[in-house]
């Protein structure tokens, strides 16, 4: 006999839809709706605190070895910035394919913005011998130091203005649900206010 199996969405999918599917399967629809309402309330309060940043642009990148990848609007961190009313630079103001989008070194300027949330997944990069380190903020700080060796990185506006914000890559550059979304919103406020 096989236990009941439920499809609850896919990584990179809309976290609200994934939560609704799971809640429906577990008979917890009201609880899920409460979680989403609480998130919306948190976002509304946070957006008020972030009003002075509404005309700034924000990039979210994952750095692996000596290369960057963009976290676009469909991934959780991108959705959180959109929810907060924060703008993305033109090269990132779009939905992606549900995963990070690699950026060649020739197009490194595509990661630039007024502020860059900079994460890494450390040694998790398959086949990349330069991908040492960890995914936490200390790992991001180490990756930023390594990134300065890449031609053009120090020319980025965000770097020159000291607006590169190291973040936990496992949180900011991965997929997740309501807990992850709340944590990202909390961190945006913590980093900027």
Give a label for each model feature.
Residues 103-112:
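Short helices/loops that flank or line small-molecule/ion binding pockets
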Residues 57-63, 91-92, 117-120:
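Short, conserved beta-strand edge motifs with alternating hydrophobic and charged residues
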Residues 53, 114-193:
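Structured C-terminal subdomain patch of bacterial secreted/periplasmic proteins
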Residues 70-100:
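Alpha-helical, coiled-coil/dimerization segments enriched in small aliphatic residues
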Residues 1-4, 113-116:
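Proline-aspartate-enriched helix->loop->beta-strand connector
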Residues 2-66, 163, 170-193:
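Extracytoplasmic substrate-binding proteins
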Residues 99-102, 117:
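Charged, long alpha-helical assembly modules
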Residues 64-68, 123-125:
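Short, catalytically relevant binding-site loops at active-site mouths
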